[in-house]
């Protein structure tokens, strides 16, 4: 399992859509499996679960991305899971790391557009 947390500044809805589009653009096999939208104490929260085939690991991996609205943007947390092999310990976690890297690339792209 691999995790990435980052605060992004800008419009919450634009952040969510931009990250989604960047993730979809980076992989031919990626799909948005499920999405949940809620509001708690006036703050929007969106949870998205993506899945893709990992050529690096030769298996399927998932990436869960949570967006929590803040005063000036969104707190983003991405957790990649799956793709490891073996029963009692994790080996071959290449797919998880590679999938999480796509989120990192998307976040850097958002920041490079002048929103950081």
Predicted regions span which residues?
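Terminal, regulation- and interaction-focused segments at domain boundaries
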Residues: 1-27, 108, 112, 116
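Hydrophobic transmembrane alpha-helix bundles
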Residues: 25-32, 66-78, 103-105, 115-116
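A conserved amphipathic terminal alpha-helix motif
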Residues: 86-116
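Short, Lys/Arg-enriched charge-dense amphipathic segments
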Residues: 4-5, 51-64, 99-105
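Ser/Thr-rich, low-complexity intrinsically disordered terminal regions
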Residues: 17-63, 71
